[in-house]
Amino acid sequence: RGIGLNIAHKELKEGNRISVGIRDLESLKGSAIDPKKWPEGKIIINHYDALKKITAENWIKNTVDEFGGFDSVINCSGVLSKVPFLYKDGDEEDILNTLNINFLAIWHLCRLSWDHLCTSGRGRIIVLVSMSGKRSKGDLAAYSSSKFALMGLCQTMKNKGWEKNIRVSAICPSWVNTKMAQNISSLDKSSMTQPEDIAEICSTILKLPTQSVPFEIALNCNYEI
């Protein structure tokens, strides 16, 4: 949905084979990446739940069984939490859920993918982090903490994969015109970064030679001091 759907569609149009992990399989019926709209063998769809590690394992196994391997992983799942620093008793579950989805699930997926990325000789990991992984605005303590942790993971993966020609790119947008931003009234939707823009950036990163892959791309659709 949103960013992920646009990235997948862009890569299909560019001739790449893709393996998509999504929680709601039914949501892809009739969409731009519905497998029925593409030649056989171009796209496989897998059930993926960020809170269930077994679904990540099955996703990778299905991909390797179908394609023989893979060279890129793009992480764009996430959840918005409004839990503040002075959280209420009982909010701990929300905090842990946010950390599990925005941080640990991505760690699990990249760890499980690591050997395949090494084997490819030019592995690429792209992570949709957020400007909230670079600075904290307001009092979204749970969300910002999860994104700061994710940025730290990206830096560590970059270090770990450097000699194996694995390159990591952390994309850090502010508001993107997706369902997550649908209730934002302070900024017109047309003034936000569009999902298609993120897809274009990902496409460019995947085409770049190893020596030119950027680690961090910060995107501001609104002015920040």
Where are the regions that the model predicts?
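C-terminal helical subdomain
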Residues: 163, 170-171, 187-225
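Canonical Rossmann dinucleotide-binding motif of NAD(H)/NADP(H)-dependent dehydrogenases/reductases
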Residues: 1-17
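Rossmann-fold cofactor-recognition segment
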Residues: 38-53
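Conserved mid-core segment of classical short-chain dehydrogenase/reductases
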Residues: 57, 80-96, 139-142
